Amino acid sequence: MNNEKMKALQAAITQIEKQFGKGSVMKLGEEHVLNVEAISTGSLSLDIALGIGGIPRGRIIEIFGPESSGKTTVALHIIAEAQKSGGTAAFIDAEHALDPVYAKALGVDIDNLIVSQPDTGEQALEICEALVRSGAIDVIVVDSVAALVPKAEIEGEMGDSHVGLQARLMSQALRKLTGSINKSKCATIFINQLREKVGIMFGNPETTPGGRALKFYSSVRLDVRKIETIKQGDEFLGSRTRVKVVKNKVAPPFKQAEFDIMYGTGISFEGNVLDVGVDNEIIQKSGSWFSYNDTRLGQGRENVKQFLRENPSILLEVENKIREKHNLKTRNTADSKVTGAKDEKSKEEK
């Protein structure tokens, strides 16, 4: 580009920045545009599948799946991770079903979690917009899109038809929200349910409520499915969960992650590190025996999980080796999950 064109471009950029503020126009190669900050999901395998070490800040994320698949559990783990790194989180509970005892067990600081239980969809999305615009929130969870009932539907009669009202509400709200979300670097998570399309002979009959707008505006879409129940004898301990990254604008999509969600305690971090460690050949598996370097970890998956829980230094070492292999930021003892979990236990014992 010749000098005159460069001067003209610089003058235009200066004028735009004067009118609309610094950062309103920029070169794509600038460092702060390329670096996408992330919040961990609490699952090492899911952080790897997402490609950047977690969900992106300043973007819209949709988590969808069947009932009791672990959607809210994943969202609560993201809140816990954001709070551990000094962030502030909000939970818009449109379903009026948030369990504070379970949230606390997952590591959420419920004393500092901002919660709203709105009456209408409009109220929920206005609260969401106000929190995003404040610039003080790191992550907002809306649970769920299906429960964002338009005011006209709530005030109407039970049998009235309200075709397309919710889709219109979501489309309008997302048009307003998307710019503010990006500027404030607030990760906004919408949890969504599944519905069946009527009369579909071929292809996937499953769809998500709330229209198509959320699919378009989301930078990341996570499909959460329960694949099996974890049992020990006759006792049900939890469920094996598979998450597929069906859309990803910040890294290659279609990657999958599997982890255990244990009843009452959420994602089993030790089990997740064990699985990823075996997949990456950092932990050796021979029959039902597991070993790391010269250390015998134990026989049977549940026993090894218990061993890793009791030996946080080995767990952290394995985790950091996995992180290095996938070009993710390593952890030190202070911010490791196990330390946090043990600190919580010791607080409760006191």
Curated annotation (Swiss-Prot):
Region Disordered, annotated ranges: 326-350
Key words of the record: ATP-binding, Cytoplasm, DNA damage, DNA recombination, DNA repair, DNA-binding, Nucleotide-binding, SOS response
Basic and acidic residues compositional bias, start-end: 340-350
GO biological process: DNA recombination; DNA repair; SOS response
Binding site for ATP: 65-72
Subcellular location, record wording: Cytoplasm
The family this protein is said to belong to: Belongs to the RecA family.
HAMAP family: RecA
Protein name (record): Protein RecA
Organism: Clostridium novyi (strain NT)
